[in-house]
Curated annotation (Swiss-Prot):
Part of a membrane-bound complex that couples electron transfer with translocation of ions across the membrane. It comes from Paramagnetospirillum magneticum (strain ATCC 700264 / AMB-1). The complex is composed of six subunits: RnfA, RnfB, RnfC, RnfD, RnfE and RnfG. InterPro entries: NqrDE/RnfAE (IPR003667), RnfE (IPR010968). Its main location: membrane. This is Ion-translocating oxidoreductase complex subunit E. Keywords: Cell inner membrane, Cell membrane, Electron transport, Membrane, Translocase, Transmembrane, Transmembrane helix, Transport. It is found in: Cell inner membrane. The keyword Cell wall biogenesis/degradation does not apply. GO terms for cellular component: plasma membrane. It is an enzyme of class 7 (translocase). One of its GO terms (biological process) is electron transport chain. Its EC number is 7.-.-.-.
Length: 223
């Protein structure tokens, strides 16, 4: 029986979060979370790729032999990354100049490939699409949260340059939370990413343990 949709959503957003539980996608997590806007943009790009890739693999899984599945998965992810890369270059060019170097690296991100192998290759189309979407959104939430903490403490702002990603209305989100010269510079550098990500992983574990939840790794959600 295919997975329940509620379980898919809960796993993707919290219980099996790709960053906070599985520790996957650490390259963009360290490099692209200097600000909340960068984390949000990178996360949404990854979510789009994961949703589309899961959908395609679920549709064609019966036509792909076990021996060649990994190269096929990589080609599917690469094709979707190319679409996202070209779209961001066309419609979000200023943000693309910041994120563009790392968008192609989504192909080598272990999280999309892990979900293709663990879920999309075994489950029907709609659950697979939702798994990719919500695993991607969970990844987005983690990157945005890490970016927000690093940005606020490191440079005293929140959602700086959000208008580049979300449009002119998003200037309302751009806040100055403390004077710029009060910031702790190390937090907007890669070591700060390791520090904040590690603290968030610990915080999630403590919340889960306090709630009496079993700590487990992600897999297919079949019941």
């Amino acid at each position: 029986m295919s997975a329940s949709y509620g379980r898919i959503i809960k796993d993707g957003l919290w219980e099996n979060n790709g960053v906070l539980c599985m520790l996957l996608g650490m390259c963009p997590t360290m490099a692209m979370t200097g600000t909340a806007t960068n984390g949000l943009g990178m996360g949404l790009a990854t979510a789009a790729v994961m949703a589309a890739s899961n959908l395609m693999v679920a549709m064609f899984r019966n036509y792909v032999t076990h021996e060649v599945r990994i190269p096929v998965y990589i080609l599917i992810v690469a094709a979707n990354v190319t679409f996202v890369d070209l779209g961001m270059n066309a419609w979000m060019h200023e943000l693309y100049k910041v994120l563009g170097l790392f968008i192609p690296l989504i192909v080598s991100n272990c999280l999309p490939l892990a979900r293709l192998e663990a879920f999309a290759a075994k489950e029907p189309v709609l659950p697979s699409f939702l798994d990719g979407l919500f695993m991607g959104l969970g990844f987005t939430l983690a990157l945005t949260a890490i970016g927000a903490v690093r940005e606020m403490i490191g440079q005293g702002t929140l959602f700086a340059d959000a208008a580049l990603l979300l449009g002119p209305w998003a200037k309302l989100l751009e806040l100055r939370v403390m004077p710029a010269d009060w910031g702790i510079l190390v937090l907007i550098l890669p070591p700060g990413g390791f520090l904040i990500a590690g603290l968030m992983v610990v915080a999630k574990r403590l919340v889960d343990l306090a709630g009496g939840k079993e700590i487990k790794m992600a897999g297919a959600h079949s019941v």
